[in-house]
Structures are given as C-alpha cells and as structure tokens.
Regions:
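Glycan-recognition and catalytic cores of secretory/periplasmic carbohydrate-active enzymes
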Residues: 1-210
Length: 210
C-alpha cells in the first residue's frame, strides 16, 4: 500500500510497526513472541518459529519500504537463532518452544495434525526459510560474497534436507506436510503453499548459486 501510494497506508504501517515493537518484538532475545490475549494483559508462554518466519518476511519488507535498516538487522538476528537450532537438528527446524526458547520436539506428538502447531518438522517451512535467508543475505551483504557464503550454504542445507525428506516421500507426488525428526512422513497432506514456496525458492537459489 505504501509503495502504491494508497491513502493512509504509511500511517497504518507506522502504527503496525509501533505496536509490533511494543508488544511482540523482544530486543534482548532477538526474537518475537507469539500470542497475546486481545487486551494485551496475558502473554501465552508458547513461542514458535512460524510467527518468527513471517516476522522476518515483514521486517524485510519494512526495511525496504521505510529505509529503516534496524528491521533488516532484526531479521538477521532471528535468522541466526534459527540456523543454530536447525544445524543442531540435522537441518530439520524445530517449530515449537517454551517461553525461554527451549525446543519442544515432542509438542503435539499425540495430535500430529494440529492445525496451528503440528508435530515434527515442516519441510515447507525449511524451504521457505531458505528463501528468506537468501533474500536477507543478498540485501545485507550485497557484494560481500565471502560474508554471504555461510548463509547461502545454510539455505541450501535447509532446502536440500526438506526436499530429501518430503519430496515424493511416500510414493505420491509432491511434498508432504510434516515429518518426524528422522525425516519420516507424519502428515501426508500436500499443501498448495508448500509447492509454491518450493518453486520460488528453487528459482532463487538457482539464480544465486549457478
């Protein structure tokens, strides 16, 4: 809306970022919390990477639109956390955490197809993180290829792990929704957004790594 010159868009963005800074972003942790009640009096102890993934996406857009580089820096801080967790877990990204950011790898094991907090790894998110990391590193490091290289390699690791685990994993075409921590499919559904992200990320990584 801001780039399109829509009336009120700049003010709406300013208000949204101010609220996010106040209620959701934790500067000390370098991560975002997940859920408040509507009165902003009770913060849910659950912490999750789905919210932080979309926060990275929003921060990159905010940096581009406003010119305020603090949002790009914040996106990088989130990414650095995610890469530590992913590397420690064979590049399968933990999704669910306690309030002090300890991964809960057993979350919803008894309800693996929970709509908002499914059990296990979500390969589509690994693919999406790979694209976001690449987008961030290109806009941050620009011509500094040596500085960018470890992040590009990490993005490839996330992408390759997700595809190896989930592509045609159960004999059916497409990318399964979730796997366990050994890469075995759990929820076999095929989501439209997963394939869309895979096509997007494939194109991005191909352009960057060729």
């Amino acid at each position: 809306g801001v780039l399109a010159g829509r009336d009120g868009a700049a003010e709406l963005l300013k208000d949204a970022l101010a609220l996010y800074d106040l209620r959701f972003w934790n500067e000390e942790e370098g991560l975002s919390c997940d859920t408040w009640n509507t009165e902003f009096t009770e913060l849910d102890p659950y912490r999750g990477l789905n919210a932080n993934m979309h926060t990275v996406e929003a921060f990159l857009a905010a940096a581009d639109v406003t010119g305020d580089e603090k949002y790009r820096v914040r996106a990088g801080r989130i990414i650095d956390h995610v890469l530590v967790w992913a590397k420690d877990n064979n590049w399968r990204i933990p999704e669910h955490f306690s309030s002090d950011w300890v991964p809960d790898l057993e979350c919803n094991k008894d309800r693996p197809d929970d709509q908002f907090k499914p059990y296990g790894a979500t390969p589509g998110h690994g693919i999406e993180w790979a694209r976001l990391i690449t987008q961030w590193v290109l806009s941050t490091y620009k011509e500094d290829k040596a500085g960018a290289a470890p992040y590009i390699e990490a993005a490839e690791n996330l992408y390759n792990r997700a595809v190896a685990d989930a592509w045609n994993a159960d004999g059916a075409p497409g990318i399964c929704y979730t796997t366990d921590w050994n890469g075995k499919p759990v929820v076999h559904d095929r989501m439209h957004w997963t394939l869309a992200e895979a096509i997007n990320t494939s194109a991005v990584l191909s352009n960057v790594t060729d």
